[in-house]
A protein has these predicted regions:
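Short glycine/proline-enriched coil/turn segments at helix->beta-strand junctions
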Residues: 70, 107, 231-234
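An internal, acidic/charged active-site-proximal segment
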Residues: 178-262
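Short, conserved catalytic/metal-binding motifs centered on acidic residues
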Residues: 64, 109-122, 153, 213-222, ...
Length: 262
């Protein structure tokens, strides 16, 4: 009964601007048709969608489930079963990508940001989890934590105040990670390249083969593997040094101090 009260939609009072957004989001979630024969999967989908939109800094299913009232001490298995057989992440990302095309004219570049991220894990048998430096520790007391590593590709809108919309999420598990699928073991740069290839293929499939794809990344992309990537109508911009590894140094160039700039 308390969960039903949380999702109850009412007309906004007109005094607070945030109530209009919450009302429309709740109305959209409650009226979205799903091909389910039982009410439990439909309510589970509503709970997760509401938590994903309303709460911030929630990345895992367990974190989303804990936002529901009453707060469960043990996460029910229905939240995990909801994605085991019926959820295709690639199809979901491509569906979200198609919805961003209406905001990008064909004569403008489709801009994405590529960056690596880690998701903290505490389980002992989670595939791909490995020990990484813990950024929450103090500088004078460095420690480790278990986490999964991913590469996120986010679409950037022309509005300077807009946040990026994640349109692709690719695992980049360490080669030494236990219980991981061999196809998920890759470096971060390999994840960047695979993400660019997927998004370029989506643009081509949408009839936008001539549209330019602009990729923006940080200094981790300063590698020859990304600098020599040949994709049609694709441009990559990353932060580089004066002696960037994107460039092939001339043969016979003296090394050490006093080396000529290239």
């Amino acid at each position: 009964m308390k969960n039903n009260k949380l999702h109850r939609t009412g007309q906004p009072d007109g005094q607070h601007h945030n109530t209009h957004l919450v009302y429309h989001l709740q109305h959209l979630i409650s009226t979205t048709p799903l091909n389910t024969t039982r009410p439990e999967p439909y309510r589970t989908h509503q709970h997760l969608a509401h938590a994903e939109l309303i709460t911030t800094a929630r990345k895992t299913i367990a974190q989303l489930a804990r936002t529901q009232h009453p707060y469960p001490n043990h996460i029910p298995n229905r939240y995990y079963r909801h994605f085991q057989r019926y959820f295709d992440p690639d199809a979901a990302f491509q569906h979200l990508f198609r919805h961003t095309l209406h905001a990008v004219p064909t004569d403008h570049p489709y801009t994405i940001a590529l960056d690596g991220t880690t998701v903290p894990r505490t389980g002992a048998y989670i595939p791909g989890a490995h020990w990484t430096p813990n950024p929450t520790n103090a500088p004078f007391a460095r420690g480790l934590r278990k986490a999964q590593r991913f590469v996120m590709a986010g679409w950037l809108d022309d509005d300077p105040n807009a946040r990026c919309v994640p349109i692709y999420w690719l695992p980049t598990f360490s080669p030494k990670a236990r219980y991981a699928n061999p196809t998920s073991r890759r470096s971060e740069i390999q994840g960047w390249i695979a993400s660019l290839q997927h998004i370029r293929a989506w643009l081509d499939a949408a009839g936008r083969a001539e549209q330019r794809l602009l990729c923006v990344g940080d200094g981790r992309g300063d590698t020859q593997a990304l600098g020599k990537l040949e994709l049609p109508n694709t441009v990559c911009c990353v932060r580089t040094r004066k002696d960037s590894r994107w460039c092939d140094l001339p043969q016979g160039t003296p090394s050490g101090r006093g080396r000529r700039r290239v």
